[in-house]
Amino acid sequence: MAWVIDCSLALAWGLPDEQSPKADDFFSLDHSQQEILVPSLWWFELANGLTMGRKRKRITEDQFLRLLGAYDALPIQTDSHSGFNFVQALQRVASQFELSGYDAAYLELALRKGAGLATLDKHLASMALRAGVFSVFPS
């Protein structure tokens, strides 16, 4: 099965003060035979979360470097959809499911790829279920 992961899950796995057993469980699974999909937005959110974590001394430089290695080891595939037609698609998903444009990027990708959605965001998870997308978190 393919999975779309959002940054709430990824950062909860990486930042010590945001640790989540659900994130730990998800990332402890063997994903070698699965696709992990992210919209290009994910990289900006990850960079911002880690940068702010370092700036606010939530993680050390060594932890930052270890996290980069851990994320790099995941079989992440970045979706490259962009352009005005994509903006329209995101707007439709955002409007239909009462999401921000950012959260719509994750749900739109899961819908388009027939993937599950792994998120710790309760609203995004509930809208994914409403859209017929399997969402593992939260329950």
What are these regions (language model features)?
Residues 5, 26-31, 73-74, 92-96, ...:
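Long, hydrophilic "mature protein body" segments
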Residues 47-77, 87-89:
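Active-site-proximal, substrate-binding regions of enzyme catalytic domains
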Residues 1-2, 79, 107-139:
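Acidic, PIN/NYN-like endoribonuclease modules and their adjacent C-terminal/linker elements
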Residues 22, 45, 89, 126-127:
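Phosphate- and divalent-cation-binding pockets in alpha/beta enzyme and binding domains
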Residues 76-116, 120:
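Active-site neighborhoods of divalent-metal-dependent phosphate/nucleic-acid chemistry enzymes
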Residues 1-41, 53-65, 131:
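Short, well-structured N-terminal submotif of metal-dependent ribonuclease cores
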Residues 9, 42, 85-86, 106, ...:
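Alpha-helix capping/helix-boundary segments
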